[in-house]
Structures are given as C-alpha cells and as structure tokens.
Amino acid sequence: MMTVESQELSEQLRWTDLPQWQQLQQWWQQQSQQHLVQLHTDLQHQLRENGATFDPWLEQQRQLDLMPWLVSDTQWQQLQAGVKQRQLLLSMVLQDLYGPQLLIQQGLLPAELIFQNKNYLLPCHQLVPTHQQWLSLLAVDIGRDAAGQFCVYADQSQMPAGLGFVLEHRLAFNHCIGELNHSIGKSQLAGFFRKLQLVFAQGTGHTAEGRRPLCGLLTQGKRDAAYFEHAFLANYLDIALMHSADLMFKDGALWLKTVTGLQQVDSLMRYLPDARCDALELDPDSTGTAGLLQSIRQQQLFCANPPGAALVDSGVLLPFLPALCQALLNEELLLPTAAAFWCGQPEQLQQVLSDVSSYRLRRIDTAQSWLWTELDVQQQQELQLQLQADPTLFIAIRLLPLSYVPCWNSTQGEHQQYGVLRLFGLLSEQHSPAVMPGALARISPDAQSLQHQ
C-alpha cells in the first residue's frame, strides 16, 4: 500500500487529472511491446546521430527515456515566476558583491563566507557595468521535498550545461514520436532560443553601425566531456564555436583569428571555468585569453555569464536567500530553497553534526563536495576533523527525498526512478525575463547521488 509520504512524492499521481496524461495513456495502450522497444531504440539512435550526448570518456552513453515528465499549467506558472525572481535576485546580489558590497556592510552576508570563497574573484570587482545584468543565463536544479513541494537544491551559472541536451531531446522526440508530441501539446522551445540569439546579437550595444555582430560559444575543446553539446548548441544558434587559442586581445577588444584576418568578437556564451578564462588576471597556468576581463570591463565584449558568476554555484548564498529577497526585492522567495546552513554559526554547525548523513557538504575554499554516505569510516573521520577545525569554510545543504517518476526503456520496461529537473532562465536589460518552456529531466535509482552530480 502506498503511504501518505510516498503519495506526496509520486509524480504519476499528480498527473492523473491532466488531459495530457489521459492522451499519453491512450497512446501508450495502442502500442505493442515490440513497437515501444523499437521506438526506444530509434530515440537512442537519433541521439547518437545528433551527437550532443556523445561523451568519449563514458563507457555507457546517456539514454533518453520514452516517458516524458508532465507539468501542469498551474505548476509551471509557479516555477516560471520563481525562476525569474531567483535569477533577478542572484544577479542583484552579484552586482553588489562585485561592487559596493552593501550586503556585507549591512550584515546580511558574512564577510568571511564571501572572501574565503574560491569562486569569489577579486579581479572581477566592478567588472560588469551597473546597467547590465550579471546573470544573463541561469540553470536552476529543483526536486521535491518531503511535503511534495518543488525546492531548489543548486544553481548553475558558471557553465549552465544542459541547454543543448534539452534541445536535442526535443528534436529526437519530434523525429521519432511526433504524433505523441502533437497529441499532448508540448510547449515550443524555439521562442526561447530566438530570444537568446537576440540577446547575444545585441551584445553590449556598442557594435559599429553596419557591422554584423560576431557571437561565439567559448569552450575548452574536445577534452571537455560536454564538447559535443557545445558544438551542437553553437550550430543551432548559428554562432561560432571558439577556443581560447582562437582569440586575442587588442585595442581594448577581443578578436577572433581567422584566415582572412582579425574579426572583433561582440558576444560570448561562456562554457569555460571562471579561473581559466584569462591567464593574465586569473589563473596564470591556464590557457585562457589574456585581456578577456579587460574587454568586458571596457564594455567591448558581452559575456554570458562573466567570470566571477560561479560564486552562485558554490551554494554560499543558499542559507541567506530568503532574507536577501526581502531586503532587495521586498518579496517572499517564490521558489523555496532546500534547507541550507553555514557551519560558521555554532547552532547551525550542531544541527548539521547531529544528522550529518542528511546533508551534502561543500568546502568553500576548495569547492570540494561530499556525501557522507559515500565516504568510508576513515574519510568520514577526516571530514569531521576538517569541519570542526574551521567550520566557517563549510556549507551544508539538506538532501531532498525527491519524487519518483514513471519511466520506460527497452531493458526494464515500465518502472519508477527518482527524478530532478533543471530549468533555464534568461535575463537581459533589453528584454523581459524568460524561462525556457521545458526542462532537462534526470533520473536515477539513487536520490542522493542524483543531487550530487
């Protein structure tokens, strides 16, 4: 018998009243087992053909499940409003922390939490002009808590991976199971990507009249496990795929080396770690383009997102977001955050230590992250010693129980696994905020490891 708690965490039970679920069930019952197996095989083949999900370092490649994740219109409106608010809030926080730092002066954020953070980059102070948004792109990872409510457990701004996967998955579904997509009325993604193209084309607004803006996607290259996603996304957006070695700084701007000479770069979609972007001002051992920060500083380059944004990814803001939202927006946080604690506060440290296996621990000066249950006894003892030696260096984020979603593949047939969603937001001073009308859904039999990936 299904318990009350498990009912709260069953996505399928939430779908029973949706007309899309009725359409899906009707379609499902019309398919033979053999045809479902063939459709699943065709989906995986289509992914291999497109290439975005290819990872040469993985023995087992990603699989696309045959069952879509349904979200009601009411639920989606709530998620959309929450992501828009969150992106604006985080952008304002970064603008302050890399600017006047009033949030620290007013005691809303502890100074040691920010300045000890590996992802807080001093060279990025006053990097972005006040009229521009710090976070043009944001990925928000959500899952359900014990009450069945969606909560954010992580934000991704440094390299918000997954846009290419969502796009590729939708194209594969349209190609292989177009009639199902049509019957359940999936929202179209094209409008979001057109707006993304427009934001990059407008860049800083300083492009010389008559010159077509040059936009690029900056990647580490083939050694990056996500390189094929980068190539797929750049091709779809009709922007150049660039590497640091392709670029040079000259006359206050960033230039692309081509066989016909130098061409000024106006906008970059950055999929390169913050510290590896500029060998002059950031990591001198990296192959980053010297002068990249200066070109942003001089408003000759629009970068999404600029180096320094990874402070958001470190999780240090999570314990303070409700108070920050009240202070900066005079609003309640629309999309709640998983319970998070800064261990530099004694009462919060004791709360974490009393139930440490229920948390994901992050060390802010090294960006290391641990799940207690994945450590052996010696590793647990070593981590506990680190935690007690300097608790100000640790953030603890409570693990969510997560909901389980119906799945189907050719090897297991119909079954259920834990699931999370990654949503994507777009923010620009020229346009109204936008949330991609879809999400990257990930599933796993292990709820904890899913939140740690």
Where in this protein do the model-derived segments appear?
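Preference for protein termini
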Residues: 1-453
